[in-house]
Amino acid sequence: MITKTAETFQFDTIDDVVSDIAKGRIVIVTDDADRENEGDLVMAAEKVTPEAINFMAMHGRGLICAPVSNERADQLGLQRMVAQNREIYRTDFTVSVDAARGVTTGISAYDRATTILAIANSKSSPEDLAQPGHVFPLRAKDGGVLRRAGHTEAAVDLAGMAGLQPAGVLCEILHDDGTMARLPELMEFRKKHGLRICTIQSLIAHRRVREKLVELEQIVKMPTDYGDFDLHLYRSKLDGQHHLALVKGEIDKNKPTLVRVHSQCLTGDVFGSRRCDCGNQLHAALRQIQEEGRGVLVYMRQEGRGIGLAAKIHAYKLQEEGLDTVEANARLGYPSDLRDYGLGAQILFDLGVRQFRFLTNNPKKVVGLEGYGLEMVEQVPIRSEANPHNAKYLETKRSKMGHLL
């Protein structure tokens, strides 16, 4: 049996897709097989028609949503549906809405198109929408697909690139039997209905060569217990947060570079906490880079797998009461892992890394770096010795989070 990959199929260029978006046409956007592995019908919100909504409802069969930028959502007073988002991919739903005027029940194709046009109208205010309703707005991450490789961000990015309001419409594509359509079926769907199709990875690549969300502020010499490094200070243009890159030797674009992307862990990295293996992994990575003679360690300010220091300490207390690290996060209302690797990928690319040998036990990090012009040629495990304080933690990472320990 021959397994077809994304490279087997013919996709349209982003320029052609943007051209269709600008003309008010529907396109198909697919994501990676390691993520949702789905295709969505996508169009610009300000170009929506009742016919387009009817097409999505009849042929897409998924949930019709209206992705918008955070700025637009704030202008319209669109509050998040829940305070703590536990959805597996953290799709940022707001409270559902209908247009305040010009609709009846709110569910017809005409009514939903009217609501979406109100969302896209730059003159609309919170008074122009009624809550709850039959259209589901989604908040896109600032920075779009360069921050989060999701359909929400792709829809808003494509609308903006087409010179339109930062608002879109999307609907998942399902089979007749209600199961998700995958890439081979999406290609047949595309052919049947004459639609253009692109991948989120190609959109990331398109934006990456035209935009940059990190900027280098300073480089200093950094002597360490593991030899001399050059310390690069980067600032995120999205939130002003600073991240670091420790670089040893010369980066050669034509040779694989040994790379570690390490998320900050104050308790483990600084205080030597034995509740986790973060400090051990940090020092093991620096040691391996020193032995290699060339490599990069990117230090991301993402404490507690992204939930922050205070929440991590509260999670520790729940772990003392018998919960594991995943259960503790869930009890606090957080997913098991909130980290965002897009900025780390941009830092690596800015440093000149193209191919890399990845020091990680976490397969999700590999997925998080894909689509940014980086090619992983080898996953290099980091071995951590269990102790009585972190044995349960390491077993949870292996059994529930897929870490290769």
Model-derived segments and spans:
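Catalytic domains of riboflavin
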Residues: 1-405
